């Protein structure tokens, strides 16, 4: 588990303070390699690359979590319309939000801050923090 003092300023802002990175700025937005997306704080698996798609919204988007336990869902009323916040199911780090405008087969769009994830390349094992 990553300690607060070992996190970047942006990781603290997003993961611990429910912030949002600017759209189209995240390191993992255009990641096309095969692999696993993990929580940057506790390294729990969140998404597989096969479920990633280009939603055009500026943040990495996925249509399905790796397992039902991987994600925790919370009602979010901080903006003018209700949303569903998503957090890591293991450490409770803020990840982003989920919307019901995604592609088949789920119809869901998990809109995730790059900085809240680390990508593990399935070929090399390299871990790249967003």
UniProtKB/Swiss-Prot annotation:
Its EC number is 1.8.4.12. One of its GO terms (cellular component) is cytoplasm. The keyword Zinc applies. Residues 1-122 form the MsrB domain. Keywords: Metal-binding, Oxidoreductase, Zinc. Binds 1 zinc ion per subunit. The zinc ion is important for the structural integrity of the protein. Zn(2+) binds at residues 39, 42, 88, 91. It catalyses: L-methionyl-[protein] + [thioredoxin]-disulfide + H2O = L-methionyl-(R)-S-oxide-[protein] + [thioredoxin]-dithiol. Belongs to the MsrB Met sulfoxide reductase family. This is Peptide methionine sulfoxide reductase MsrB. The gene is msrB.
């Amino acid at each position: 588990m990553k300690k607060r003092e070992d996190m970047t300023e942006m990781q603290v802002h997003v993961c611990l303070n429910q912030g949002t990175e600017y759209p189209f700025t995240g390191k993992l937005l255009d990641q096309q390699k095969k692999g696993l997306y993990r929580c940057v704080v506790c390294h729990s698996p969140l998404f597989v690359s096969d479920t990633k798609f280009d939603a055009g919204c500026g943040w990495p988007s996925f249509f399905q979590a790796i397992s039902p336990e991987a994600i925790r869902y919370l009602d979010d009323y901080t903006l003018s319309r209700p949303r569903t916040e998503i957090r890591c199911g293991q450490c409770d780090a803020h990840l982003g939000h989920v919307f019901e405008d995604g592609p088949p087969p789920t119809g869901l769009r998990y809109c995730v801050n790059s900085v809240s994830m680390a990508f593990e390349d399935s070929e090399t094992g390299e871990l790249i923090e967003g």
